[in-house]
């Protein structure tokens, strides 16, 4: 296909999805010619393609051939983001449409903004489609298991280039507002096609965007316009509840503010939300509890592998007050019978992962108790995936996993496929498969070519549920339930 055909196809794509109008045609063609360092142009007589992945590949192959772009994943991503940036409207236009739609209906505004973020290729739909997703029916509810394949692995050239690249503090991190329209470099993603929505959260200037990796439907990131550290406190609870007041069709939660039990970015205050129902949301209250002075707030312990107190009521300020009381109690609480130590050597260990949503007209806040204490037996964390499950999951249990969605490493796609084949043929488990030997030795199945992979996928789901039990403070035993009640009693003292 001629390069002009790809240029024409991309301009038609922009028109068809509303990124541009017919009056923009000549300017868009000229922008693309400039990026491709092409001086001449005749409209193509070949049939156009509507497949964005195919269009961008054609343009990238041309750029590589002409020496405009290195032929590595990172370099190609930077260049095709520049291409899409040439078609992306300015922030004022995007913000204007969002605000106009929001006045009609918040859901209409986010529907439009999500589609826009996909159409600009900020969210690469064709990569997201490669992710593996399946369900596991646990005793706590139907959990989501995913193997993330859409986040590209860095190629060796990019790793070397990033190592040799001059260090810069702009943007300060991948969440800062300065990423909007940023060209990118070998050690920082390109965001030329990225547009952010300014919003108010509890009276503060915040921003709304989507995650480019979309772990679940309309996976959004809500972040402070200032580069300020994560902090779980009463203010955080008020902000979460403020967001679901403004966007009642979305849930929103925050990672904890301590290492091991927190997320990967602790330096910039942010939340994650979206339009998705997680297993934790549908998990019932197993035991109702009452907090003195807050009889207007319904409270209960949730039937979930992690230790969750659910607060529901009509007044978000009252919920935030009670959540703060529980948090302050938990920060200073120790119970050596279950391994909870509030402080060691002056370091705090206890915090909370909070999740807010609307329940009809009411507001709801789930408080997940966390503790990042380590021991000689569990050097990565007592309430962290234990070593016998590291073949499947050894990374931190963050907000998304807490709610019942496993984000598993991409290595597992090949490992589980190869493992299934080895179980059928009886081949020895060597190399990358050796780490799975103890796991599969405990399985009692008749493996066949037809069922082996399905069995392993379900067993992977079982491991994830057990990982959440590892991360839970109070185990689902009589002793664990009694210890949980002891903490509730402590809050009420």
What is the role of each PLM region?
Residues 1-222, 226-229, 303-305, 319-323, ...:
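Active-site microenvironments that recognize anionic phosphate/pyrophosphate groups
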Residues 193-195, 225-252:
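Helical scaffold of the NTase/Pol beta-like nucleotidyltransferase catalytic core
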